[in-house]
Amino acid sequence: MAFQFSNNPESNETTNNPAPHVLGLPRPPSVGGISSRVTDMSEDGDQSQTNTMSSHVPHRHSVSRRGPPPARSSIASTSQITNRPGSSASRLSRTHIPSLAASGFFRPMSSQRLQAHRGRPATNHTVSTEDWGDQMNQNRRSLISNSTFPNSLSAADQEVPPSRGTEFTDPIIPDRIHSNASPTANTTTVRSESANLIRDRERPPHLNLKVDYKGTNENETPERSPLSFLSLQNRNAPADNRDSRAHARLSSADSSPQSIEKKPELAKSRNKGRNYEYFVGNTIFLGGGRFQNSRDKPVNIATGLLVLVPTGLFFGFSGPWLWHNISPAIPVLFAYVFYLCFSSFIHASVVDPGVIPRNLHQMPPVDPSQDPLAIGPPTNDWVMVKLATSDVAAMDVPVKYCKTCSIWRPPRCYHCRVCDNCIETLDHHCVWLNNCVGRRNYRYFFAFVSTSTLLALFLLGASLAHILVYRSREGISFSDAIDKWRVPFAMVIYGALAAPYPASLWAYHLFLVGRGETTREYLNSHKFAKADRHRPFTQGNVIRNWIAVFGRPRPPTYMQFKEYYQEGDQRLSTVKRRFLPRNTEPQNDIEMQHVPPPNSA
């Protein structure tokens, strides 16, 4: 913005006798012969001005002409003419004159006075201007203040609502710099002068700040404001013209209940079966996918019999005698320990140990034209794991790509060659359970080992107490008591033989959990020197390691074998497992078996 000296007599005459304001407001006086009209230079240096208010504001004939170049101390020397669009800071510098009386040259009007000052008729579309010069006959720069009312509204409906920014845009506020920015109005005790001026000012008769300005015609809504997202460019264009490439429609649940009907897709998926029927691992399933076990020698059946048979013999011979002659608490407590032992055995044997889904990270197919001797993509990598013992320390642990399952194994995950599955946090494959011991069934395995040890010791002690009490009551020798109760004596021998093995496993795994390691990690660490052995997953001490393993909740299964099969599930095969060839490992991975036709599935 520039202030220029006018040499035109007409201009001086107009300056001395300014035209009256439309609202009757007094105009500021001229200072030192400088034109009271603040002219704004156009962005391109041309005299491009719009005459949008020529029909409402009297036309002024006073035009400031360019004088000689001003001196260095001149006011106009602070402004420069440029061809590029000015920034917000440059636009503010055109309207702010700190060297002169600001109240005499610049009085920003409030939104109410500015709307009344315009007085232009309503239009069907939002009026927007392209010139950024702050000219007096130009629209306001606020997008909300432009007229957006349709022609069908009456004059009463066109009444402009009051602005919410009156406190900061009112022209009679002299202490603009000292305004209170606190969200509460009681932070100061001294009342600002601007508050008194706002309270005592004379409000225009046609404005009422307490009235909610709404159009009487509710059928016709005003056009969208330029700030609305619905008024963006090409918003009214047909939807077919949109580029929908790489877009996917998200599914959402119904907001209201509908009639329960079986959809064709759901019925079709149910006809295809469940997920376990398409699983390609070396696993057998029972109970509709609820129970699973490795397709190997069923040693777990023998393990269950080793628990069931002695328990049955105890309740058949020693239990009734102990109930009536010593205490009923002995057989009851023995039954409770047996329940814990056998239930933990069932859970550890038939529960999903943590099978990782297959085909999640498939390698790209090999190009036939590529050199067959070329090195393929890497199958080993390192993953940084944050240590629980420090806030800043971390350690790299190796991870490997499983070519059988086509996945990058997470840390502590290994592929079991018996189950032919990648198991999360695999400890070992237990032949007594005929199942892998992983993250989801490790607690059941540890509970089975612990309770089987207690059960064997309980069996030994209760059977021996039966023989000794009977010998003392009858007054016979120990050999005669054994001859009378041979089965309890056999249970004493069985308990003495069965207790050491689960007891050693219990102590060994208690030691491993206290170190924060699995069986595989502990055995693999002995391949390195003692100085190179690290435990990145330890919690710092034995108690925390025990809590982290035995106190953590069991994670959900990844495979969901009981669910219905969905066509296109990459985790599963496209053909049911009963139609796939079996026993390819004894044939050196050469499939010499009959392959059924594709339509047989």
Curated annotation (Swiss-Prot):
Residues 74-92, 123-155, 179-195 have a biased composition (Polar residues). Residues 198-223 have a biased composition (Basic and acidic residues). InterPro entries: Palmitoyltrfase_DHHC, PFA4/ZDH16/20/ERF2-like. One of its GO terms (biological process) is protein targeting to membrane. It is found in: Endoplasmic reticulum membrane. Autopalmitoylated. Its EC number is 2.3.1.225. GO terms for cellular component: endoplasmic reticulum; endoplasmic reticulum membrane; Golgi apparatus. Residues 1-18 have a biased composition (Low complexity). It comes from the Eukaryota. Keywords: Acyltransferase, Endoplasmic reticulum, Lipoprotein, Membrane, Palmitate, Transferase, Transmembrane, Transmembrane helix. It catalyses: L-cysteinyl-[protein] + hexadecanoyl-CoA = S-hexadecanoyl-L-cysteinyl-[protein] + CoA. The active site is at C430. The keyword DNA repair does not apply. One of its GO terms (molecular function) is protein-cysteine S-palmitoyltransferase activity. Residues 400-450 form the DHHC domain. Residues 322-325, 466-486 are lumenal. The chain crosses the membrane at residues 301-321, 326-346, 445-465, 487-507. Residues 1-95, 112-268, 582-601 are annotated as: Disordered. Residues 1-300, 347-444, 508-601 are cytoplasmic. PANTHER family: PALMITOYLTRANSFERASE APP (PTHR22883:SF43), ZINC FINGER DHHC DOMAIN CONTAINING PROTEIN (PTHR22883). Belongs to the DHHC palmitoyltransferase family. ERF2/ZDHHC9 subfamily. Palmitoyltransferase specific for Ras proteins. The DHHC domain is required for palmitoyltransferase activity. This is Palmitoyltransferase erf2. It comes from Emericella nidulans (strain FGSC A4 / ATCC 38163 / CBS 112.46 / NRRL 194 / M139) (Aspergillus nidulans). The gene is erf2.
